[in-house]
Amino acid sequence: MAATAVAAAVAGTESAQGPPGPAASLELWLNKATDPSMSEQDWSAIQNFCEQVNTDPNGPTHAPWLLAHKIQSPQEKEALYALTVLEMCMNHCGEKFHSEVAKFRFLNELIKVLSPKYLGSWATGKVKGRVIEILFSWTVWFPEDIKIRDAYQMLKKQGIIKQDPKLPVDKILPPPSPWPKSSIFDADEEKSKLLTRLLKSNHPEDLQAANRLIKNLVKEEQEKSEKVSKRVSAVEEVRSHVKVLQEMLSMYRRPGQAPPDQEALQVVYERCEKLRPTLFRLASDTTDDDDALAEILQANDLLTQGVLLYKQVMEGRVTFGNRVTSSLGDIPVSRVFQNPAGCMKTCPLIDLEVDNGPAQMGTVVPSLLHQDLAALGISDAPVTGMVSGQNCCEEKRNPSSSTLPGGGVQNPSADRNLLDLLSAQPAPCPLNYVSQKSVPKEVPPGTKSSPGWSWEAGPLAPSPSSQNTPLAQVFVPLESVKPSSLPPLIVYDRNGFRILLHFSQTGAPGHPEVQVLLLTMMSTAPQPVWDIMFQVAVPKSMRVKLQPASSSKLPAFSPLMPPAVISQMLLLDNPHKEPIRLRYKLTFNQGGQPFSEVGEVKDFPDLAVLGAA
């Protein structure tokens, strides 16, 4: 048949590659938008489908094939609805969707509806008429799409299309502009004006020049898109590999768990090393986009930290068991990766000062990244004026020391102080307690006047005398917690940011005397919340330990998506069975504004009720 020749001629110009796999969410909205049982088309479903196409990175490539399947439906109403969705997408789904539809691969699917050899023998006249009308309208509205014009002209030559249809004056969907407002043709104002002038000309040489200009612009845009795609792919690969590396290294400190497979760990590490020059090349090629460059540098910081942590572990500076040696304090691997510089950025109870002066140390810390790593105890660069491990939220000051303008500490005994803090010589102190001689310079109100309280910001390194105390060895997985029937306590609830404290049915596994509590943080605010740091204090007759939080940031709330939740375990040892009192300090950033809140959790249930729950 004639249409067969058209399809064969068209297909010969491109690879016969099958359509990509559809996305479930796209199918869901398309099924609603093309439901043949509806008397009228669901325009809200069409709008949601278009939004999903624009949101999903693979939407512009998957959607045309989903639409082609619907257009070829034996049910007339479903096919007509799908053609309406196709027109809507051509108006609202951007250049990438447009380019997919303008390929011969997709145009062949429309030709099949018209060809008696394929579906034309049983497709209704209304469906075939709408397909012809759409193809003709595209040749009018998109003269730069040569493939659409060629396909339409070949159909006319073969007699499939007898004459050009008349476009209805009262068309439901307005004709789209020749290209979107954010199109590549508007990026350069001079080229845009030149192209407009050439397209309006009746001289063949001007039209040829316009065609060459369009091809050059499209080529430039494709090269730009390829760069963006490579950058996004590389950054995503860095994040995924560092996450895997983090999880494998965390096995070294989980009680009773075998170490990770060394061969697999080595493969992940080597891949991380190979990604570093890739990021360097991307950074050198991304000089005109500050946001993209910042994303690459952030990924490089994350990758560098993962590599350094791997080297620390493989050099034997981290031991098997529950605890990491003094090079890492007792900061868990997961916490290190949640917020590489979180201690310095969000914890106002500390003042980590890195001495960059060669006169004091003889070595210069090479970069801010290395300073951050040094503050976490995982850098080989020398650090002074700061503490590690249990002192993440504690500092030891010498009254005679003075701070230099560059942030260093002019203190001749800085090395000695650091050694004192890391050695086992200081007097024993209870787990997670801050010595009253080293009260932080920025303590929540009421703390200095309440010497019976101590502050805890996370799982800190235990002192020598507390190695055998329960909390030093206790770790409760989140999935093992069984919620109690008791209602949760509201810890904080302002500006859409809410923190609840939940109770568990049982104590910590193997340590029934340790009460397990669960903090949950969520946000219904339109702005994201980040750099979240939660600290707690209990009377000295009790002990408390905060396990790492699942995250340090919450996205902006969307009514179309379930709210994100941060979870953090709180372990409480109350050996004297006293009424529970708990104070907290909360710091976070919301909408670009920093917040620092202090309060006390009240209305704890009686111990008898708590134990029976």
From Swiss-Prot:
It is a peripheral membrane protein. Residues 389-414, 435-466 are annotated as: Disordered. GO terms for cellular component: clathrin-coated vesicle; early endosome membrane; endosome membrane; Golgi apparatus; trans-Golgi network. SUPFAM superfamilies: Clathrin adaptor appendage domain (SSF49348), ENTH/VHS domain (SSF48464), GAT-like domain (SSF89009). Keywords: Endosome, Golgi apparatus, Membrane, Phosphoprotein, Protein transport, Transport, Ubl conjugation. Pfam families: Alpha_adaptinC2 (PF02883), GAT (PF03127), GGA_N-GAT (PF18308), VHS (PF00790). GO terms for molecular function: phosphatidylinositol binding; small GTPase binding; ubiquitin binding. Its main location: Golgi. It is found in: Golgi apparatus, trans-Golgi network membrane; Endosome membrane; Early endosome membrane. Residues 399-414 have a biased composition (Polar residues). It comes from the Eukaryota. The keyword Membrane applies. Residues 316-483 are annotated as: Unstructured hinge. The modification Phosphoserine is found at S400. Residues 188-315 form the GAT domain. Residues 33-163 form the VHS domain. The keyword Ubl conjugation applies. SMART domains: Alpha_adaptinC2 (SM00809), VHS (SM00288). Ubiquitously expressed. Plays a role in protein sorting and trafficking between the trans-Golgi network (TGN) and endosomes. Mediates the ARF-dependent recruitment of clathrin to the TGN and binds ubiquitinated proteins and membrane cargo molecules with a cytosolic acidic cluster-dileucine (DXXLL) motif. Mediates export of the GPCR receptor ADRA2B to the cell surface. Regulates retrograde transport of phosphorylated form of BACE1 from endosomes to the trans-Golgi network. Belongs to the GGA protein family. Monomer. Interacts with NECAP1, TSG101, UBC and AFTPH/aftiphilin. Interacts with CNST. Interacts with GGA1 and GGA3. Binds to clathrin and activated ARFs, such as ARF1, ARF5 and ARF6. Binds RABEP1 and RABGEF1. Interacts with the type-I membrane proteins LRP3, M6PR/CD-MPR, IGF2R/CI-MPR and BACE1. Interacts (via N-terminal VHS domain) with SORL1/sorLA and SORT1 (via C-terminal cytosolic domain). Binds the accessory proteins CCDC91, P200, SYNRG, EPN4 and NECAP2. Interacts with ADRA2B. The VHS domain functions as a recognition module for sorting signals composed of an acidic cluster followed by two leucines (DXXLL motif). This is ADP-ribosylation factor-binding protein GGA2. It comes from Homo sapiens (Human). The lineage of its organism: Eukaryota, Metazoa, Chordata, Craniata, Vertebrata.
